[in-house]
Amino acid sequence: MTSSADSGRDAAWLDDFLALTLAGDAPPAEAGECAARAVRWRWLGDGLLRLEPADAAQRMQSVLVSAGVHGDETAPIELLSTLVRDIARGALPLRCRLLVALGNPGAMRAGERYLDDDLNRLFGGRHAQLAASREAPRAAQLEAAAALFFSTAGRARGARWHIDMHTAIRTSVFEQFALLPHTGEPPTRTMFEWLGEAQIAAVLLHTTKGSTFSHFTAQACGALACTLELGKVMPFGANDLSRFAPADAAVRRLVSGRRDAPRGALPRAFTVVDQITKQSDALELFVANDVPNFTPFARGTLLARDGDYRYAVRHEQERIVFPNPSVKPGLRAGLLVIETTRDTHAALA
């Protein structure tokens, strides 16, 4: 029988989940207890950790929180490691089944966005098309971990959540914003209210199925899923985490089952109307490197040229998000969105 002292020693690494992951180490045991035996934990592999209350109820929420799908997006990784520490110490009560995922440990250790291919473009089985990529087996592993985790989750609305935390390459008109995957259903008021509580200023609504982690969990696992963009890419240790306090607090309230959050304003909504796809390395993107995400452009403005391909603004005003001419040919070099706040809020399910 494992003693309380042995259990505490085995769980000491939970004080710095990030350090263990960056070192590429495994914990001394694969399962144990923490938080004075109030929480059970199981290490599921590199950067993967499941936590659940010792008295977990059958109808308890199941929440997946991920960060580091892009290895250089350090602030959310640090927030997530601190969340694990506080749960393990008993400083933050756990009132859900929680799966913690540091998405791309190899890229995190290298200090790079990715090693071979953008991991957040390889979900929904797309990894099978790039079998030689070092990101491909990780995408398959994350899919399997999420599917297994949610396979025993409740099916009521709001029983399954996935919060995938990122930071952006560029600054943004809205410093912190969210992206909701396309599911064929209207977005939920539950998600919009939670994003308002997190003081997320804007939400981008996808209109086609995608290959991101949050698309996979929404489509394949039935989760209320979102991608959070919480600021700008910075090196480990250089982040001012206080800038992310509202979003961090909202995640903590979600996993601790608290319902005492002040209701924030619903975020503004923007719907994707088109994208710029890189046809070749000859792509010219007429958007300067210092242009923030969500910058508006007027009808007729030429934004991209690539051989015979042109993209000019078709609506009275379109805003560009994630302009990036450095992506590989065939991938998205920018999203174009229009504001749909009134209609989106009216249609919330």
UniProtKB/Swiss-Prot annotation:
UniProt KW Aminoacyl-tRNA synthetase keyword: no
Ranges annotated as spanning the membrane: none
Pfam (any one): AstE_AspA_cat
Gene Ontology BP, a term: arginine catabolic process to glutamate
Cofactor(s) required for function per UniProt: Zn(2+)
Pathway assigned in UniProt: Amino-acid degradation; L-arginine degradation via AST pathway; L-glutamate and succinate from L-arginine: step 5/5
Matches recorded under InterPro entries: AspA/AstE_fam (IPR050178), AstE_AspA_cat (IPR055438), Aste_AspA_hybrid_dom (IPR007036), SuccinylGlu_desuccinylase (IPR016681)
Enzyme type, top EC level: hydrolase
Active site: residue positions: 229
Catalyzed chemical reaction(s): N-succinyl-L-glutamate + H2O = L-glutamate + succinate
Alphabetized GO MF terms: hydrolase activity, acting on ester bonds; succinylglutamate desuccinylase activity; zinc ion binding
Cofactor comment: Binds 1 zinc ion per subunit.
Alphabetic keyword roster: Arginine metabolism, Hydrolase, Metal-binding, Zinc
Binding positions for Zn(2+) per the UniProt entry: 70, 73, 166
Family of the protein in this entry: Belongs to the AspA/AstE family. Succinylglutamate desuccinylase subfamily.
Protein name: Succinylglutamate desuccinylase
